[in-house]
C-alpha cells in the first residue's frame, strides 16, 4: 500500500540543514514565496506533508497546489493528508485490531497473502480505558472475581512469552530522566508531616508513594478482568509490524501521546519533517498545544491510515483566535478553557481549524495550551493549533528533551517558517479573526447537563435554583416550588445527615482535561491542605475520587506534599485511566440511593472532566457540573452546589469562625512556586523508562504466536466479526433501499453514548442476557467498552442507553416498536425480528446526530442491526464518516426541513434508490407508503467517500486492495 515514489514530484526542494551535513528537509517556503508567508501555520504543516508525499497517485500535484492556494480554495476542495503516526486507545483500538485480524482471515479465504495485512503507519496503542473503580475509600467492596469474564479457557491460545517491544525514541537520544530512590515518598519540608500514609508502589514509577491500597487492588482486578483482551493486544504487537502497545497503568492515550509519544519534529532516514498524528480518541487534539498537528477521526479511517492510505478532509477554514490581556488571579486554566469554549461555540467554528495568536498566547504555559486544545471537540472545531514558539522550546528543555535534537528542531522549524515569534511584525491571514480578552474571563462551571452551558461561580446558586423551576430540558428539572426545600434524613456510617436538592454525592478529580495541568491540580492540593489545616472536612457519604491521567500527577502531588491532604478529604487515587469519566464509577451506597429516590432529589456530581451528559456518572445523579479541580474540592467540602461562595461559608474552624472559600483559595504565586519546584524539572523524568519497561503483570502475560489469530468460539471478549462475511473480489452495484421501516425516531443531540454506551452493562439488557446465557454472572459482565472486540455484545448494546429518548416510546428507554407486530421490544430484539423478516431499517433523527466521543461501534452496531441509512438534520462529522466507513448512507433533510415539518410520523415505509453516478451533495428522492415524496441530500463530501460507500465501507475497500 505504500506510495511508489513519495516525494519524487518535489524532490528539487530537498535541502540540507545548515547545522548538519546529514539532516535533510523539504524547503517548502521556496515553493510558495509570498503565498506561503500568508498561510496559517497549521496549513503550512498540511502543505509540507503533501509535498513530501506527492507521488501523483494518492497525493497529486493538484492537491499540493490547492493547499498552497488555501486562501481561495478553503472549504471548496478535498485534500488528502498523511499523518506521521497513529495513536489508539483500547476501547477503539481493540475493534481496530480485531478488524485487522479478521481482514487477514478474509484475505486468505479469497486467495490473498494474510502476511501483507499490517499497519504501514507507526501505531501506538495505549491501554487506558479498561480501568473500573471497584475499590475506593468510601466503600472497599468485595473484589470481583479476578478472573471475571474469563471463565472460558482460551484453549486455542498457544502460550508464548512475548518480550515487550522497545518503543521508538520520541525526540531524544536518552530518556527524560529517572526517579531517584525514594523520590516519590519524600514530602516537602515546608508541609506538616502529621498525616501518616501507607506507602505502596506507584505503577508508574515502581517507587513507594503515600497513597491507599486501592490503586494496586484496582489494577489487580483490571488485569484479571481483562486478561483475554490484554493477551490479544500482546498478540497484535507481535503479529503486526509497526504496532507498539503501551500497557495498563501508564496513563490515558491523549496524555501519554503528549508526554511520551510526541516528537514535535520527526526524523526518518535523516529526513526532518513536522510531527503529526491522528487517533481514535477525539481528545488527541491535546497535542496541538505543543505545536503538533493532530485530530481525532473514526476508528475505520484510522485503520485506513494504518494501511498507508491518507485521511481526507475538506481544506478547512482557519479561524484566527487572538488572545489579548491577562487572566486575573482567581481564574484557572479550566476557566479559560470554558470561556474560550463558550465564545467559539457562539461564533461557530464547527468543521474548522482554530489557530491562536496574539500577545496573550505567550502568557499561557504548554499545559494551559494543551488543556485548551484538548477541549476543541467540545466547541466543534477539528483542532485548535498553537504554533511552536519559545514557550514550547522552554517546556521541552525543562522536560529533558535532548539538547542536540532541540537545536536541530529549532533550526528546522525556523527554516520552514513553522516557528512563531512575538517579534514578527506580521501574522498569517485567516478566514476570520476573533478576539478574546483574557481579562473578561471569570471563574465558572458548566452544567447541569451539557459542557457548553457555562455558569459563573458567582451565579451558581441562583442558576441552580432557576434549573429547579424550569421545565425538563438541558437547563431544567421542573421541581414543584413547594418541594424545592425538601430534605431527606439519612443515616450513614453511624451519623445523621440531610440531603436536599443540590446535595453533592459524587466529587471526582478525574482523567482527561485537567490532570495534565499541574497548576490546577496543585491548586486543588493546596486548597485541600488549607482546608484540612482549618478543620474543614468532606461528608463521608460523598463518593470522592482522584483518577490521574498518568503517574506524573502522583509524582508531583506527592513530591509537593499535598497528596496527603487530598487523601484526608477523601480524594484518594483510585487508579490510572478513564474511570468516572466514562461511567465506570463505584456505586453510591444503598442508604444514599434510597434517600435520593425517597425525596426525588436532584443531587449533583461535580467533576473535573469535559463531559457531563445526563446519566453519564450515575442514573440517580441528575445534575452534573464540570469544574476546575480546586472547585471540585470546594464543592465537596460545601456538600452542595446550592451555595454562594462570596457570602456563605464552607464551614467553621475549631473556634466556630466561619471559613469562606477566599480564606483557603491558593494564590497564583503559591501555585507557580510549587509548580516550578516540584513539577517542571522532574515530572517527565521516568515516563519513557516506565513505558519501555512495561509492568510486571503485562510482561508475564502469555500470547499466541501465529499469523492468523486463533479465535476461541467460547470467548465473550474476542470474536471474529461478520463484516467480511459477504466480501467478494469486486464490489456489487449500489442496491436500492426498498420498503424500509424506521427502527428509531430520535430528536436532537443524540450522542454516541446514546447509540453505543461505554459504561456498565445493565442486568436487564440484551447484552446481559447474552452473557448470562454463556455462564457469566453480573459481576463478570465488565463494560461495553471492554467488550468492543465482541460483535455479539456490541450489537446487543447498540441503543441500549437508558437515557435514549425514542419518540415512538415517549419516554427515556432503550425500547422501540416493531411495527409489523405492534410489539414494544428492546431495540436489539426488534431489529432481530426485522432482519428475520428481510426488512431493511432506517433511523430518523434531528440535529447533531452522533455528537460526543468518537466511537466506531456507534456506526458498526446499527449496521449489524440492519440499518441501511440515517436521515437527520445534521451530523457530527466524525460519526458521519463512521457511517460511510461501514456502509450506511448518511442522508440529510433539505435546509429548513425535518421530520416534523414534512409531517412524518416514522410509521411510514420508506423507499429510495441510488443512481449509478453519485456525486457529493447529490439530491435523492424518498417515497413513502402514504404516497408522500420528499427530497434529501446524500451527505457525501468527496469522491473518496462515495467510492467507500459503493464498496460497502472502508473495510471492504481496503481488504480488496490486498487481493
From Swiss-Prot:
SUPFAM superfamilies: Aconitase iron-sulfur domain, LeuD/IlvD-like. It comes from the Eukaryota. It is found in: Cytoplasm. GO terms for cellular component: axon; cytoplasm; cytosol; neuronal cell body. Ubiquitously expressed in rat tissues, the highest amounts present in skeletal muscle and heart. Binds 1 [4Fe-4S] cluster per subunit. [4Fe-4S]-binding affects RNA-binding activity, thereby inhibiting activity of the protein. Ubiquitinated and degraded by the proteasome in presence of high level of iron and oxygen. Ubiquitinated by a SCF complex containing FBXL5. Upon iron and oxygen depletion FBXL5 is degraded, preventing ubiquitination and allowing its RNA-binding activity. GO terms for biological process: cellular response to epidermal growth factor stimulus; cellular response to hypoxia; cellular response to iron(III) ion; cellular response to manganese ion; cellular response to mercaptoethanol; cellular response to retinoic acid; erythrocyte homeostasis; intestinal absorption. Keywords: 4Fe-4S, Cytoplasm, Iron, Iron-sulfur, Metal-binding, RNA-binding, Ubl conjugation. It holds the Pfam family Aconitase_C. GO terms for molecular function: 4 iron, 4 sulfur cluster binding; aconitate hydratase activity; iron-responsive element binding; metal ion binding; mRNA regulatory element binding translation repressor activity; regulatory region RNA binding; RNA binding. [4Fe-4S] cluster binds at residues 512, 578, 581. Its main location: cytoplasm. Its cofactor is [4Fe-4S] cluster. The keyword Cytoplasm applies. Coiled coil: none annotated. Signal peptide: none annotated. InterPro entries: AcnA_IRP_Swivel (IPR044137), Acnase/IPM_dHydase_lsu_aba_1/3 (IPR015931), Acoase/IPM_deHydtase_lsu_aba (IPR001030), Aconitase/3IPM_dehydase_swvl (IPR015928), Aconitase/IRP2 (IPR006249), Aconitase_4Fe-4S_BS (IPR018136), Aconitase_4Fe-4S_dom (IPR036008), AconitaseA/IPMdHydase_ssu_swvl (IPR000573). Interacts with RBCK1 only in iron-rich conditions. Interacts (when associated with the 4Fe-4S) with FBXL5. Interacts with CIAO1 and CIAO2A. Belongs to the aconitase/IPM isomerase family. RNA-binding protein that binds to iron-responsive elements (IRES), which are stem-loop structures found in the 5'-UTR of ferritin, and delta aminolevulinic acid synthase mRNAs, and in the 3'-UTR of transferrin receptor mRNA. Binding to the IRE element in ferritin results in the repression of its mRNA translation. Binding of the protein to the transferrin receptor mRNA inhibits the degradation of this otherwise rapidly degraded mRNA. This is Iron-responsive element-binding protein 2. It comes from Rattus norvegicus (Rat).
Amino acid at each position: 500500500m505504500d506510495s511508489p515514489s513519495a516525494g519524487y514530484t518535489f524532490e528539487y526542494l530537498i535541502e540540507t540543514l545548515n547545522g548538519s551535513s546529514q539532516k535533510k528537509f523539504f524547503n517548502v517556503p521556496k515553493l510558495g514565496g509570498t503565498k506561503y508567508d500568508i498561510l496559517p501555520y497549521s496549513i503550512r504543516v498540511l502543505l509540507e506533508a503533501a509535498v513530501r508525499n506527492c507521488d501523483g497517485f494518492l497525493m497529486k500535484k493538484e492537491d499540493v497546489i490547492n493547499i498552497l492556494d488555501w486562501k481561495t480554495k478553503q472549504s471548496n476542495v478535498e485534500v488528502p493528508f498523511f499523518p506521521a503516526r497513529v495513536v489508539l486507545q483500547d476501547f477503539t483500538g481493540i475493534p481496530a485490531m480485531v478488524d485487522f485480524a479478521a481482514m487477514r482471515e478474509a484475505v486468505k479465504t479469497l486467495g490473498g497473502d494474510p502476511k501483507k495485512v499490517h499497519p504501514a503507519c507507526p501505531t501506538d496503542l495505549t491501554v487506558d480505558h479498561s480501568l473500573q473503580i471497584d475499590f475506593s475509600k468510601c466503600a472497599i467492596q468485595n473484589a470481583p472475581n479476578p478472573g471475571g469474564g474469563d471463565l472460558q479457557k482460551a484453549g486455542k491460545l498457544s502460550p508464548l512469552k512475548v518480550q515487550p517491544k522497545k518503543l521508538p525514541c520520541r525526540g531524544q537520544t536518552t530518556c527524560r530522566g529517572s526517579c531517584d530512590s525514594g523520590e516519590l515518598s519524600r514530602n516537602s519540608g515546608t508541609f506538616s508531616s502529621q498525616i501518616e500514609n501507607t506507602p505502596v508502589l506507584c505503577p508508574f514509577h515502581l517507587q513507594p508513594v503515600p497513597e491507599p491500597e486501592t490503586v494496586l487492588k484496582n489494577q489487580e482486578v483490571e488485569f484479571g478482568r481483562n486478561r483475554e483482551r490484554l493477551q490479544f493486544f500482546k498478540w497484535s504487537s507481535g503479529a503486526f509490524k509497526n504496532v507498539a502497545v503501551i500497557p495498563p497503568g501508564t496513563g490515558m492515550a491523549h496524555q501519554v501521546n503528549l508526554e511520551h509519544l510526541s516528537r514535535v519534529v520527526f526524523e526518518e532516514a535523516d529526513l526532518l519533517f513536522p510531527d503529526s498524528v491522528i487517533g481514535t480518541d477525539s481528545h488527541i487534539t491535546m497535542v496541538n498545544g505543543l505545536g503538533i498537528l493532530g485530530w481525532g477521526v473514526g476508528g475505520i479511517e484510522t485503520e485506513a491510515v494504518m494501511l498507508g492510505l491518507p485521511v481526507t478532509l475538506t481544506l478547512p477554514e482557519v479561524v484566527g483566535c487572538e488572545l489579548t490581556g491577562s487572566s486575573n488571579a482567581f481564574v484557572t486554566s479550566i476557566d479559560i478553557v470554558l470561556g474560550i469554549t463558550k465564545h467559539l461555540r457562539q461564533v461557530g467554528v464547527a468543521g474548522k481549524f482554530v489557530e491562536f495568536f496574539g500577545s496573550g498566547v505567550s502568557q499561557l504555559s504548554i499545559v494551559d495550551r494543551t488543556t485548551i486544545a484538548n477541549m476543541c471537540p467540545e466547541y466543534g472545531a477539528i483542532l485548535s493549533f498553537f504554533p511552536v514558539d519559545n514557550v514550547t522550546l522552554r517546556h521541552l528543555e525543562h522536560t529533558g528533551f535532548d539538547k542536540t535534537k532541540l537545536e536541530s528542531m529549532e533550526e528546522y522549524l525556523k527554516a520552514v517558517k513553522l516557528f512563531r515569534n512575538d517579534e514578527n511584525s506580521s501574522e498569517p491571514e485567516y478566514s476570520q479573526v476573533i478576539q478574546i480578552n483574557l481579562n473578561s474571563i471569570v471563574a465558572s462551571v458548566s452544567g447541569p447537563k451539557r459542557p457548553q452551558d457555562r455558569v459563573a461561580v458567582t451565579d451558581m446558586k441562583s442558576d441552580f435554583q432557576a434549573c429547579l423551576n424550569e421545565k425538563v430540558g438541558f437547563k431544567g428539572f421542573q421541581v414543584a416550588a413547594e418541594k424545592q426545600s425538601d430534605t431527606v434524613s439519612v443515616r450513614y456510617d453511624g451519623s445523621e445527615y440531610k440531603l436536599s436538592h443540590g446535595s453533592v454525592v459524587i466529587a471526582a478529580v478525574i482523567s482527561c482535561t485537567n490532570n495534565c495541568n499541574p497548576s490546577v491540580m496543585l491548586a486543588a492540593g493546596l486548597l485541600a491542605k488549607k482546608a484540612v489545616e482549618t478543620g474543614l472536612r468532606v461528608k463521608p457519604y460523598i463518593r470522592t475520587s482522584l483518577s490521574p491521567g498518568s503517574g506524573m500527577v502522583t509524582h508531583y502531588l506527592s513530591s509537593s506534599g499535598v497528596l496527603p491532604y487530598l487523601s484526608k478529604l477523601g480524594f484518594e487515587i483510585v487508579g490510572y485511566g478513564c474511570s468516572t469519566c466514562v461511567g465506570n464509577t463505584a456505586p453510591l451506597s444503598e442508604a444514599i440511593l434510597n434517600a435520593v429516590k425517597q425525596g426525588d432529589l436532584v443531587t449533583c456530581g461535580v467533576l473535573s472532566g469535559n463531559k457531563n451528559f445526563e446519566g453519564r456518572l450515575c442514573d440517580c445523579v441528575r445534575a452534573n457540573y464540570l469544574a476546575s479541580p480546586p472547585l471540585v474540592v470546594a464543592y465537596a467540602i460545601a456538600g452542595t452546589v446550592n451555595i454562594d461562595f462570596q457570602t456563605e461559608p464552607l464551614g467553621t474552624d475549631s473556634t466556630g469562625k466561619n471559613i469562606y472559600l477566599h480564606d483557603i483559595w491558593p494564590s497564583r504565586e503559591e501555585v507557580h512556586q510549587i509548580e516550578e519546584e516540584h513539577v517542571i524539572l522532574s515530572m517527565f523524568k521516568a515516563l519513557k523508562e516506565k513505558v519501555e519497561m512495561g509492568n510486571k503483570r503485562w510482561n508475564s502475560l502469555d500470547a499466541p504466536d501465529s499469523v492468523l489469530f486463533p479465535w476461541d468460539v467460547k470467548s465473550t471478549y474476542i470474536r471474529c466479526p461478520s463484516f467480511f462475511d459477504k466480501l467478494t473480489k469486486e464490489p456489487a452495484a449500489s442496491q436500492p433501499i426498498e420498503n424500509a421501516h424506521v427502527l428509531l425516531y430520535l430528536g436532537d443531540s443524540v450522542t454516541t453514548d446514546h447509540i453505543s454506551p461505554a459504561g456498565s452493562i445493565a442486568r436487564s439488557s440484551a447484552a446481559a442476557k447474552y452473557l448470562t446465557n454463556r455462564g457469566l454472572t453480573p459481576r463478570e459482565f465488565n463494560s461495553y467498552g471492554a467488550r468492543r472486540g465482541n460483535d455479539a455484545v456490541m450489537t446487543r448494546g447498540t441503543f441500549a442507553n437508558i437515557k435514549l429518548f425514542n419518540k415512538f416510546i415517549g419516554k427515556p428507554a432503550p425500547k422501540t416498536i416493531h411495527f409489523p407486530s405492534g410489539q414494544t421490544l428492546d431495540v436489539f430484539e426488534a431489529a432481530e425480528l426485522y432482519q428475520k423478516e428481510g426488512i431493511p431499517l432506517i433511523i430518523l433523527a434531528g440535529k447533531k446526530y452522533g455528537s460526543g466521543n468518537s466511537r466506531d461501534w456507534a456506526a458498526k452496531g446499527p449496521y449489524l442491526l440492519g440499518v441501511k441509512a440515517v436521515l437527520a438534520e445534521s451530523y457530527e462529522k466524525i460519526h458521519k464518516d463512521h457511517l460511510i466507513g461501514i456502509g450506511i448512507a448518511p442522508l440529510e433533510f433539505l435546509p429548513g426541513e425535518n421530520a416534523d415539518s414534512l409531517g412524518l410520523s416514522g410509521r411510514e415505509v420508506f423507499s429510495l434508490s441510488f443512481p449509478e453516478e453519485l456525486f457529493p451533495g447529490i439530491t435523492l428522492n424518498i417515497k413513502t407508503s402514504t404516497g408522500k415524496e420528499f427530497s434529501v441530500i446524500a451527505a457525501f463530501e468527496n469522491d473518496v467517500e462515495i467510492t467507500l460507500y459503493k464498496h460497502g465501507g472502508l473495510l471492504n475497500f481496503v481488504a480488496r486492495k490486498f487481493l
